[in-house]
């Protein structure tokens, strides 16, 4: 599917968001945060996540996910690298169901509290049960053996399993934040995406002109990997930056 075909699926709201990329990033963030509070679906999901310590991120990210899902066809494929406790994976499924879209979704994650140099260790919980419980809370279909690949995305056997799933329309990268790991993930997505696919990078805005007080801009390893392997690659264009999330689209 080419870029022209994908653009025809954009809602008017998505077109407006696309125009944000050249505007003040702090204003973009605030505008989307205001919009978040006017969407009860997003508000309910994010509130549950925050109250139960089920994820990181920020409120405006939910709005971007809504618009990305709105832009997808009736059937599409989604991959998340670094699921943690299931916030984004469940949100994508929730929004897909609300739009009567058939989303074939997968998450790659070690199902443990293993960290990286930025996060030495995460909570000591049963990650499989935590993710299953989150999906159950929102009445979302989920099968651990089908929807989760247990392991690290840098492991060769895990990479092979991902490649066997085919081509993805949307990929979210929030796995290991170490430079070599991020590079490995970026090289992988170049193989498993197509023209028009969205790639969302977390912790990615270290070098962006964001002046919001208290803003978390990301991690230097992630940002350096993006600079070296996405920004310097004419296969991608940046769609929008919201806080420490950056959205790219594959164009060739």
Task: State where each predicted segment sits.
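S-adenosylmethionine/decaboxylated-SAM
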Residues: 32-252
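Rossmann-like AdoMet
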Residues: 1-56
